[in-house]
């Protein structure tokens, strides 16, 4: 599977996460706001083939009034459900679509995010979080 399909799958996972916190399409239209991905990192841990059944787990690592630090990990349950095959780390920015500037998220969304972060606080930080690109010299 090539990079475009990984990005597409992770993009759908981001949409599902946004729906979960109350930022569905209707809410975005009503509030005239959306989120922009301002930074993204992908890691490829193991090859998957077109047609493999894939699963994505998402979690929010951190947030403030305008930003969300989101992490997705993809597995291939039919091969090895515990083997991470790819990850996607994102920084999302809440944007007022009328001014095209960052804005504070509504209080209801911030409250939902805060609850999610508290529920996930005991989980270990994935090793891929904060990774950088570079050639490691010996």
Protein language model features and the residues they cover:
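Hot-dog-fold acyl-thioester-processing enzymes
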Residues: 1-37, 93-138
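Hydrophobic beta-strand-centered segment that forms part of the acyl-chain substrate-binding groove
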Residues: 17-69, 83-88
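Core beta-strand residues in small-molecule sensory/regulatory alpha/beta domains
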Residues: 45, 73-79
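Short coil/turn motifs at secondary-structure junctions
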Residues: 63-65, 77-79, 93-97
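Generic alpha-helical hydrophobic packing signal
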Residues: 67-68, 73, 102
């Amino acid at each position: 599977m090539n990079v475009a399909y990984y990005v597409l799958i992770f993009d759908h996972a981001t949409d599902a996460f946004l729906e979960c916190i109350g930022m569905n399409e209707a809410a975005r239209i009503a509030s005239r706001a959306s989120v922009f991905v301002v930074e993204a990192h992908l890691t490829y841990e193991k090859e998957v083939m077109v047609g493999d059944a894939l699963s994505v787990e998402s979690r929010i690592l951190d947030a403030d009034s305008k930003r969300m630090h989101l992490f997705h990990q993809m597995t291939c349950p039919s091969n090895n459900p515990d083997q991470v095959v790819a990850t996607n780390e994102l920084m999302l920015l809440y944007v007022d679509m009328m001014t095209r500037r960052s804005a504070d998220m509504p209080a209801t969304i911030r409250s939902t995010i805060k609850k999610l972060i508290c529920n996930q606080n005991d989980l270990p930080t994935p090793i891929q979080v904060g990774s950088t690109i570079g050639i490691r010299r010996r």
